[in-house]
Structures are given as structure tokens and as C-alpha cells.
Curated annotation (Swiss-Prot):
EC numbers, comma separated: 2.7.7.6
SMART domains, sorted: RNA_pol_Rpb6 (SM01409)
Catalytic activity field: RNA(n) + a ribonucleoside 5'-triphosphate = RNA(n+1) + diphosphate
Self-association state and partner proteins as the record states: The RNAP catalytic core consists of 2 alpha, 1 beta, 1 beta' and 1 omega subunit. When a sigma factor is associated with the core the holoenzyme is formed, which can initiate transcription.
GO molecular function, one term: DNA binding
GO biological process, one term: DNA-templated transcription
Entry protein name: DNA-directed RNA polymerase subunit omega
Lineage: Bacteria, Bacillati, Actinomycetota, Actinomycetes, Mycobacteriales
UniProt keyword annotations, A-Z: DNA-directed RNA polymerase, Nucleotidyltransferase, Transcription, Transferase
Family note: Belongs to the RNA polymerase subunit omega family.
GO CC entries: DNA-directed RNA polymerase complex
Function: Promotes RNA polymerase assembly. Latches the N- and C-terminal regions of the beta' subunit thereby facilitating its interaction with the beta and alpha subunits.
Amino acid sequence: MSTPHADAQLNAADDLGIDSSAASAYDTPLGITNPPIDELLSRASSKYALVIYAAKRARQINDYYNQLGDGILEYVGPLVEPGLQEKPLSIALREIHGDLLEHTEGE
């Protein structure tokens, strides 16, 4: 499956005379590029509101992981299957993209 980002990498590799098989050996980066920022911006009134929304949810996810050892279940864990060593912010952005959270701005 080809993505615009991967196509741009291959075109840049061709322009520089680099073997395209080496350029395509790297995985497409995750995080802010997946899900795409343009799709995330439709879930909030501004990019600043999106940052606050994602940061609050990432903090909840981080607190959830920290409380597991104590046996306290005050916070809700990830609503999507987290990848190996995936950061709480990346998990939060995927939850926002999947419309798995209810959010009222200003709270």
C-alpha cells in the first residue's frame, strides 16, 4: 500500500540517486502523521484545542498505567489497542481520530 509520504520519500530518493529499495525499507512514521493532522483538526475547533484535548487524555492514560501497580482503578485505560512502546499521546490521538471520546471544549 502506497501513501503520499512514502511516495514523496521514493521520489526524493530518485532525485538524489539513492537506491529506492533502501528508501522504502523504513516504516511510515506513526504519531502525528498517523492519524493525519488534517483529519484530527476536524475533531476540535482549533489546533490549540486539539493539543489540550489530546494532552489531557494522554495524561489520563499515563496515570492509568502508573496506578496499575497500586491496584487502584481510578482512570480509564486506552480505548484502542496500544502498540508496543507506543506513547500515551499517540494513543490519545488515535482515540480522538476514532471518535472514541466525548469532549466538551473548555472543560
